């Protein structure tokens, strides 16, 4: 029920905020093993799904470099430690959070989420630029999925690029 309400609240709102909320949602923490992800023993399940299915997408740029590396998944998993379901809500346990610096997409920082570190890792993911289209990669990824779902299975990248620009220009608001 709670996760369903979360999706309803953000369905046509801020996609970046939805991503932040889903990341620490009790149902998601249980479903993808985030609740067992602790400093020194991070679980990579959600980190992998976040990049692959929700924010970046698998694949390669025209120059042959991948959208992300295995190392990025490992470091992202470390940034997502410390959260655990607490009945119908969620609790942050500082003792379970990996406080050390992480290197994700080539940047080294104290990554975490929800104000628990110097750099919000979800904001950082959404700042990544698609090397081929020079637009935020997450916007290109989401807009490609929307185009394929509602228009045609073969995306027109000129239209997708314009959609991605609109999405990022409007603070990740899907209804824009």
Annotate the PLM regions.
Residues 1-176:
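Active-site substrate-binding loop specific to GH73 endo-beta-N-acetylglucosaminidase modules
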